[in-house]
Amino acid sequence: MKADIHPDYHTIKVVMTDGTEYETRSTWGTEGATMNLEIDPKSHPAWTGGNQQLVDRGGRVSKFKKRFEGLGL
């Protein structure tokens, strides 16, 4: 293996949409950083059978709906 070509692998805290927190190792962020998830397996429609409403953080869903509202889909 070549030296000094791999990203830094460290411990981060992940906060799920229901507030559950856990620690894992990742190359994301810096040591001790917190990753707040907007969608996780407990809230994603693919894993909940479509029963969960999408959370519109940043206005992306409403922007999409406004853009394509005339199509009647």
Swiss-Prot record:
UniProt keyword annotations, A-Z: Ribonucleoprotein, Ribosomal protein, RNA-binding, rRNA-binding
Domain of life: Bacteria
GO cellular component, one term: ribosome
Pfam families xrefs: Ribosomal_L31
PROSITE patterns: RIBOSOMAL_L31 (PS01143)
Gene Ontology terms: biological process: translation
Ranges in coiled-coil conformation: none
GO MF annotations, alphabetized: rRNA binding; structural constituent of ribosome
PANTHER family the UniProt entry points to: 50S RIBOSOMAL PROTEIN L31, CHLOROPLASTIC, LARGE RIBOSOMAL SUBUNIT PROTEIN BL31A
Family (UniProt): Belongs to the bacterial ribosomal protein bL31 family. Type A subfamily.
Summary of the function given for this chain in its UniProt record: Binds the 23S rRNA.
Assembly: Part of the 50S ribosomal subunit.
Protein name: Large ribosomal subunit protein bL31
Lineage: Bacteria, Pseudomonadati, Pseudomonadota, Alphaproteobacteria, Hyphomicrobiales
Gene: rpmE
